Amino acid sequence: MGTLTTSLVVPSKLNNEQQSSIFIHKTRRKCKKNQSIVPVARLFGPAIFEASKLKVLFLGVDEEKHPGKLPRTYTLTHSDITSKLTLAISQTINNSQLQGWYNRLQRDEVVAEWKKVKGKMSLHVHCHISGGHFMLDLFARLRNYIFCKELPVVLKAFVHGDENLLRNYPELQEALVWVYFHSNIQEFNKVECWGPLRDATSPSSSSGGVGGVKSTSFTSNSNKKWELPKPCEEACACCFPPVSVMPWLSSNLDGVGEENGTIQQGLQEQQS
């Protein structure tokens, strides 16, 4: 995922070694008077998934067990030092990845869980936009942009890391992806449907939306197909797990959830 800071300005003409760096902080001492100066930052470049930079950990789960029978979650974190991603696949969120002052300050992790609701599988992805400390609030709009831009990369990491599961159960590629943006700012506190997993891993070719992703608001009554799944109120066999494996989301974040009446829904439109 992209870092939350931008780089310094540098000359537009760089040698090959300099161009290979994502963030460049050095400038030439001698520059021509008319040489143009441009900002260089991966933040505004394309979101690209690199499998070689992904480390996958299976913690207490069967690589091929259907998530409709055994809880399955994803915890994805990014290192700004190594630029590598770590994906933990387990029955509950891997809290050890989220420890430490730096992780609590950045809050750039993405967590997700598979759910079966009334017999249909769906993937529920959670991102923390703001809330917790003032720095996150100050850069809420930028963080929202980055998460939207990088989410296709995140979803590709899930698909690549859990490829055996998806190979054995290809129907999971048709499962809807619901993205929860948690924020103490109403504008960014929302839920969006990014469509089937197979489509959500590809950013829209349209440049009209945030990060190349064009979303439009809709009401649950306008299209039943995209209605946010609601589990049965009583014990049943068609919903699993019976309770979310992420109870901390509702207790620690004053954000998304039907219980507080602040849900906003959106639908990602994939443009061909």
UniProtKB/Swiss-Prot annotation:
GO terms for cellular component: chloroplast. It comes from the Eukaryota. Changing residue 143 to S: In gf; stay-green leaf phenotype during leaf dark-induced senescence, and red-brown color of ripe fruits. The keyword Plastid applies. The keyword Chloroplast applies. Residues 1-50 form a transit peptide. Signal peptide: none annotated. Interacts with PSY1. This is Protein STAY-GREEN 1, chloroplastic. It comes from Solanum lycopersicum (Tomato). The gene is SGR1.
